[in-house]
Swiss-Prot record:
PANTHER family: MITOCHONDRIAL 28S RIBOSOMAL PROTEIN S21, SMALL RIBOSOMAL SUBUNIT PROTEIN BS21. This is Small ribosomal subunit protein bS21. Belongs to the bacterial ribosomal protein bS21 family. The lineage of its organism: Bacteria, Pseudomonadati, Dictyoglomota, Dictyoglomia, Dictyoglomales. One of its GO terms (molecular function) is structural constituent of ribosome. Gene3D superfamilies: Ribosomal protein S8 (1.20.5.1150). Keywords: Ribonucleoprotein, Ribosomal protein. The keyword NAD does not apply. Pfam families: Ribosomal_S21. One of its GO terms (biological process) is translation. HAMAP family: Ribosomal_bS21.
Amino acid sequence: MTEVRVGKDESLDSALKRFKKKLQEDGVLADIRRHEYYEKPSEKRNRKKAQSKKKK
């Protein structure tokens, strides 16, 4: 669970910015987007193959 504590003199905007950055670093947003719709096993396999080719 991602958690950000707001300091006494810290604005809500800066705390929200830190929270969003932390979510991005933890990969939570990418995970949510990936699970937004059902992905067939064959599509998942094809996506992983494409990613591995992209890395090389």
